[in-house]
């Protein structure tokens, strides 16, 4: 669907920003600043994978010395169960469709408290004006069946588990060459005339294959996003 393609394009653009910062950046690095953090789903019926992407930016003010204030942002993509009511199944009780919604959130780093600011209340540098660049979770697309992220190294091999600042693959934190992304979405309305079991293969993990007996059409969009700012160290 077009909405799923738009989502994938958005994620690709953010992945390409992962790890970017200006050469004179003065923000002290912490474990919260790893460029890409992928959290794998533990229950495919209730959750999808999650990705957090961190990159830097700068605000210029010629009247100040130094003229630049450096910033750090974190963008997250994650799933929650859909809140769309399944009208065909809802009688006395409210029943939601068997799908996920994908959300996006953007936060800004607070160097003073060494924590991510609340995007609902954070402000522009040196101002009391709300920073409109950040936001709490915003729904991007619904009717999603799964969202998968895989960290891939320079040899095209899957990094498993995905690296964090402290786990067994932490030496690969800055060696993620690409991120494989798979989004599977179902049609809003029934598509096929006949209801029968249909299987949609998952990316790299047979346990995540989607097997449903219904009339809905399911399509997967799979793409590899290059991390152009990683692997340079």
Predicted regions and their residues:
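Short linear sequence signals and composition-biased patches located at protein termini or domain-edge surfaces
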Residues: 42-44, 129-233
């Amino acid at each position: 669907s077009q909405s799923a393609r738009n989502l994938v394009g958005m994620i690709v653009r953010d992945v390409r920003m992962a790890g970017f910062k200006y050469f004179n950046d003065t923000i002290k690095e912490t474990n919260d600043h790893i460029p890409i953090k992928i959290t794998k789903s533990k229950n495919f019926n209730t959750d999808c994978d999650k990705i957090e992407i961190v990159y830097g930016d700068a605000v210029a003010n010629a009247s100040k010395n130094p003229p630049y204030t450096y910033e750090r942002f974190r963008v997250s993509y994650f799933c929650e169960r859909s809140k769309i009511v399944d009208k065909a199944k809802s009688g006395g009780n409210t029943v939601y469709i068997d799908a996920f919604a994908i959300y996006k959130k953007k936060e800004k780093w607070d160097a003073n408290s060494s924590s991510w600011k609340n995007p609902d209340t954070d402000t522009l540098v040196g101002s009391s004006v709300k920073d409109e660049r950040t936001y709490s979770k915003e729904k991007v697309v619904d009717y999603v069946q799964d969202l998968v992220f895989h960290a891939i190294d320079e040899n095209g091999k899957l990094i498993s588990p995905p690296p964090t600042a402290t786990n067994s693959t932490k030496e690969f934190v800055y060696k993620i060459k690409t991120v494989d992304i798979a989004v599977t979405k179902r049609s809003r309305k029934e598509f096929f005339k006949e209801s029968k079991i249909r299987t949609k293969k998952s990316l790299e993990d047979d346990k995540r294959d989607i097997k449903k007996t219904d009339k809905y059409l399911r399509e997967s969009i799979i793409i590899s996003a290059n991390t152009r700012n990683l692997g340079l160290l």
